Curated annotation (Swiss-Prot):
One of its GO terms (cellular component) is extracellular region. The gene is NXPE3. This is NXPE family member 3. InterPro entries: Ig_E-set, NXPE4_C, NXPH/NXPE. Residues 1-30 form the signal peptide. It comes from Homo sapiens (Human). It is found in: Secreted. Glycans are attached at N237, N292, N346. Belongs to the NXPE family. Its main location: secreted. PANTHER family: NXPE FAMILY MEMBER, NXPE FAMILY MEMBER 3. Keywords: Glycoprotein, Secreted, Signal.
């Protein structure tokens, strides 16, 4: 009897595996069937950046050598990006703490104050920063975040900050809903702290270090790894052959480089700051602290007339700012009508017969987790992958939906990842046929915050090339980019994952993918505009809005 029972269980297991394989094959065939053999020339089919002449800035090559041969257009693009970001930090020499920016002494004032404003009007706010001696600052470079909000309406939007490099800043808001609207301004980091962060970015890229385990038989060794390592010891070169993405490990003493089996985060370097520098990173003093108003901090907004409202409803153009706003806890993009996917059946209907590829860090893994939790028909299969690492796979057999998640290649600060699972996004994209039933979403940013900007630019350049090739061979493929987001900060976290670092990455990402033909989920504005505290992994209500926007790109409203 037990023998028959065992045979029955074995048969059932084999049958289940066979069903999954058949489903994967069937869904994958959809990609081939929907692939159109049209040689479509994209708006920017080369994936190149076109810019006016820019003045290059003097920077030493990362690691002391150039790791990638750039075309003249790529060199121009990189110089333009670096120059634009470099101008934000003035070089004023050493500054004592008492002369650094004090948020409690600084203030803002509403400039164009009026009895009331109409929806769609511009609101201007002047911010004047002072030091701890209550003396006006004479230079800029502080990193400010600003938003307008109405808590009772669960409404919010971000403002655009302009630095006049003299201690004065202007913030521009668009008033997008009626009612009592409050202004909030925060000092994320003083300019003196920003200079420290910039030094760490350029001089201490190894402040997050990685390791790999090498094993052969009973012998095992662990060595340090990174994008760049000192050349005075023998190295294992794991640079990717297709993308040229560099990755090195110190060579084990007894084992060959080919015996590497895992990759994992080694840890964070300590003692990065001097005592004087540490004063610029104090919780409750100068990290994400509010700047108070001098006078009223709110305005009254009244509705527009119907004709005016219709003309305001959707703003056109790639430079629309802000890109959207919250109202009753729902994100409202200003360029298009976003659908609300409040029922699992709505998501199932949208994704039916589709293959969805999610590539990147843990912030897009949240999408996988949300979908598999919210949609009961999406059943996750246990691939034996480490928790929080992946790869992960979920299938809806009834509706032919295949959902995949895979983390991006190193640098990645996850716990143990098998080395054969370290796949670069560009290489994965090159293996996708594409078509109208293929959806790709990418989020690559958080694990690059400690490196010089050239490292991130190179990674995005490789991904962009692969995206352009994918869209050229399959124009109906939907490609979505999830931007960076703000997060909680303390003295230590600021040195590795500061919003200032991520703001730079976000700026680079937007510029490099402008005109390529991808959709953008603006996670940056969606976290800054919301009333909930900033988190690396935003709360569910924010993730839900991100997914609603993502799915609206996949299944837009019919017009």
């Amino acid at each position: 009897m037990w023998t028959n029972f065992f045979k029955l269980r074995l048969f059932c297991c084999l049958l289940a595996v066979l069903m999954v394989v058949v489903l994967v094959i069937n869904v994958t065939q959809v990609e081939y069937l929907d692939h159109e053999t049209v040689s479509a020339t994209f708006i920017d089919s080369s994936g190149q950046f076109v810019s006016s002449q820019v003045t290059g800035i003097s920077r030493n090559p990362y690691c002391g050598y150039d790791q990638q041969t750039l075309s003249s257009q790529e060199r121009m693009e990189e110089d333009s990006l670096l120059a634009a970001l470099h101008r934000q930090v003035p070089d004023v020499g050493p500054v004592p703490f008492v002369k650094s920016t004090d948020p409690s002494s600084s203030y803002f004032v509403i400039l164009n104050s009026a009895a009331f404003f109409k929806v769609g009007s511009q609101l201007e706010v002047l911010v004047h920063v002072q030091d701890f001696q209550r003396k006006p600052k004479k230079y800029g470079g502080d990193y400010l975040q600003a938003r307008i909000h109405s808590l009772k309406l669960q409404a919010g939007a971000v403002g655009r900050v302009v630095d006049y490099q003299n201690g004065f800043y202007k913030v521009f808001f668009t008033l997008l809903w009626p009612g009592k609207v409050k202004v909030s301004v925060s000092l994320v980091h003083p300019s003196e702290g920003i200079r420290v962060l910039q030094r760490l970015q350029e001089d201490k890229p190894d402040r997050v270090y990685f390791k790999s385990l090498f094993r052969s038989g009973r012998i095992s060794e662990t060595t340090e790894c990174n994008v760049c390592l000192p050349g005075n010891l023998p190295l294992c070169n794991f640079t990717d052959l297709y993308t040229g993405e560099p990755w090195f490990c110190f060579k084990p003493k007894k084992l060959p480089c080919s015996s590497r089996i895992t990759h994992f985060k080694g840890g964070y370097l300590k003692g990065l700051l001097t005592a004087a520098e540490s004063a610029f990173f104090q919780s409750g003093v100068n990290i994400k602290m509010p700047v108070n108003s001098s006078g009223p901090d709110w305005v009254t907004v009244i509705p527009r007339r119907i004709k005016e409202t219709n003309s305001l409803e959707l703003s056109q153009g790639s430079g629309t700012f802000p890109s959207g706003y919250y109202y009753k806890d729902q994100w409202r993009p200003r360029k298009f009508k976003m659908r609300q996917f409040n029922d699992p059946d709505n998501i199932t209907e949208c994704l039916q017969r589709k293959v969805v590829h999610l590539f990147g860090d843990s912030t897009i893994r949240q999408w996988f987790e949300y979908l598999t939790t919210f949609v009961p028909d999406l059943v996750e299969f246990n691939l034996g992958s480490p928790k929080n690492v992946g790869p992960f796979l979920a299938v809806d057999q009834k509706h032919n939906i295949l959902l995949k998640y895979r983390c991006h290649g190193p640098p990645i600060r996850f716990t143990t990842v098998f080395s054969n699972e370290l796949h670069y996004v560009a290489n994965e994209l090159n293996g996708i046929v594409g078509g109208k039933n293929t959806v790709v979403a990418i989020a690559v940013w958080s694990h690059f915050s400690t490196f010089p900007l050239e490292v991130y630019i190179r990674r995005l350049r490789n991904i962009r090339r692969a995206v352009v090739r994918l869209l050229d061979r399959s124009p109906k493929t939907v490609v979505v980019i999830r931007t960076a987001n703000a997060q909680e900060l303390g003295p230590e976290v600021s040195l590795f994952n500061s919003d200032w670092y991520n703001f730079q990455l976000d700026t680079i990402l937007r510029r490099m993918f402008s005109g390529v033909g991808v959709y953008l989920v603006d996670a940056w504005e969606m976290t800054l505009a919301h009333y909930l505290p900033h988190k690396l992994h935003p709360d569910e209500v924010i993730v839900k809005n991100q997914l609603d926007m993502f799915l609206s790109f996949v299944c837009p409203l019919e017009t």
